[in-house]
Amino acid sequence: MPVTPEVTSLPGGLRVVTTQVASAQSVSVSVFVGAGSRGEEERTKGLAHFLEHMMFKGTPKRPSAVEVAEAIEGAGGVLNAYTAKELTCYWNHVPDDRLETGIEVLADMLHNALLSPEEIDRERNVVQQEIKRTRDQPGAWAGELLGQAMYGDQPMGWSTAGTEDTVAALAQADFQEWIGLWYGAPNVVVSVAGNTSHETVAGLVGRYFSDERTAQSPSVASVGGSVPARRAIGEARPIAQANVAMGMPALPRRDPDRYVLMILNSVLGRGMSSRLFKEVRERRGLAYSVGSAVSRHSDTGILAISAGVSPENVREAVRVILEELDKLAQEPVGQDELTKARDYTVGGFRLSLETPMALGQRAGENLLTLGEIEPIEDVVEKLRAVGAEDVIRVGQRVLRRERVALSVVGPDVEEEALLEIVS
């Protein structure tokens, strides 16, 4: 097991966390910024994600994207980033003797990005192609439509990538303003995990992030209106399969029942022994893929279900899924099934933390979003303490038919018919 993460707050307010893994031969370096698509406005949809792209496009020290990439790849590492609703993360994974390179490159990118108008125009088309690619993937697009159905015309319901039109209108001044609002202490966490010491990490971060800005970190609007905003949304496409996504409001990030929901989700739709897999696929043969997942945000959460079914089986598949939701909210889970779900959830949690990258990502995100790092054994203890009465209680909180939203992408989709199915 790794040692307990160590945390230091630098004089400017930036937080540094190190998770030492002495057996590793590498280190992961992650910089978390508490800025995601929820901070955007109608005009700036996609700004957080577009800026993430632009951070890779050169600095005075490394004037091109190729030189930025070569700095890490030439050290034997990998470099990437992602944007979510409430955060953006830039990361690399390098051999342990190249830790300084990993930290210095990310600091250079985030502090000194050129953001040249010419490069912005070039990358604009790349981002628009990414948006088109998502639209061309029916399963991914059904997920985007589910967000619209649940949250409507507000940041939680918008695509993180924005639209082709909003991306087309973003300019250098928008990126500079966004950086001033969000990219600074105490809104930044640097998380390192692997074969190193906290003293070494804190010293390097203090050196290369010494000019850390101060972020304004404006508050984001809470989820407004009724959720779901629409019960059903669909898009007709001449394809062979109907891609079904269902979702309902779940629990926010700090809710004490989040551990119970993890167990409930395992019972419902995680793995080949889950209820949805057994009932929808194995017993009825309605789908090849079916499952559920939970996501959490500061003030809301989502329990989402996805399935790929034959067009003629959409109604039956949704009916069966709704019945399984009802059962979990009304009938206690048997002890054997509960024990297996707890073991599966605990095992999956432990297996997900096998690498320095996973440990560093968890520690950094925890510190940024929760203000603390939940000890691994505390999470395991809380998962193992979940009882059948907890599952049915949380099932009654979350698994409510009147709050289920449905999206379908496939042939002959009609929203009126979908609304009838889910009502």
Language-model segments: what does each one mean?
Residues 3-5, 9, 20, 67-217, ...:
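Charge-rich, well-structured scaffold segments of protease-associated domains
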Residues 13, 20-72, 246, 256-268, ...:
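Active/ligand-binding-proximal structured segments within catalytic/core domains
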Residues 18, 37, 55, 214-215, ...:
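A glycine- and charged-residue-rich anion-binding loop/surface
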